[in-house]
């Protein structure tokens, strides 16, 4: 069962498309109906999109390359979308993401 601040491989639907892709996500909150998660990408944060965070301790979380968390596009996933746990975010990254979420609310 995915828990907050874990990194998982999950099936994610592309924006404006029916295409699916298995990609890493950060679990924010496990609610009853949905598991709120954030996309993780290997692309650097984009200046034109606020709410993108460059993970400082990406390798400690089990990721194999530098990664960015996209806070601007939360996902509502269900338990069957989750495939394998990759790891856990470091406290430094958790705190930074919490601060960004509070700032952009």
PLM regions: where:
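C-terminal terminal-subdomain/extension
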Residues: 58-105
């Amino acid at each position: 069962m995915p828990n907050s601040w874990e990194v998982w491989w999950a099936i994610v639907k592309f924006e404006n498309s029916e295409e699916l892709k298995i990609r890493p996500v950060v679990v924010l909150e496990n609610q009853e109906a949905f598991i709120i998660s954030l996309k993780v990408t290997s692309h650097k944060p984009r200046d034109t999109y606020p709410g993108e965070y460059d993970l400082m301790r990406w390798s400690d979380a089990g990721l194999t390359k530098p990664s960015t968390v996209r806070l601007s596009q939360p996902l509502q996933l269900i338990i069957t979308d989750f495939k394998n746990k990759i790891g856990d975010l470091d406290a430094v990254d958790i705190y930074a993401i919490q601060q960004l979420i509070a700032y952009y609310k």
